[in-house]
Amino acid sequence: MAHGIPYVATATTADLHDLEYKVRRAINIRGAKYIQIFVPCPLGWGLPSEQSINISRLVKESGLYPVFEAEHGVVTGVLKIRRKIPVEEYLKPQRRYAHLFGKEPLVDVIAKIQAIADHNIQKYQLLDEEAMS
């Protein structure tokens, strides 16, 4: 996005209609295009494969993974968060983050991760104010 290429987008496996829309859109744009897709790895992340779609939804709803489109370096659209969740809801189901929630939870680390999510929410204006009220 920093290079101002014609089209950049992010997507998750939780919303295949959004992903399809972005792929079709990218096909019709001249020049460089880039789509980053959040795809969970059940084996590597230590979660049941049937939770893959849910983890994709949780990362978006936590704000850790903003889902957006940008043209020539300018954000033109975002997929709003309907129900903001704490990052713990995304992190806890994954065995790769178990060390954060042991006998002595790493509260400071979790708070830093939450701060990143909150920054994304503010930067990309991700909250759907109508759905939140």
Predicted regions and their residues:
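Short, surface-exposed amphipathic charged segments that create phosphate/polyanion-binding patches used
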Residues: 23-26, 50-52
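Glycine-rich beta-alpha junction loops
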Residues: 15, 38-43
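Flexible, low-complexity linker and terminal segments
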Residues: 41-133
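Short, conserved beta-strand edge motifs with alternating hydrophobic and charged residues
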Residues: 9-11, 34-38
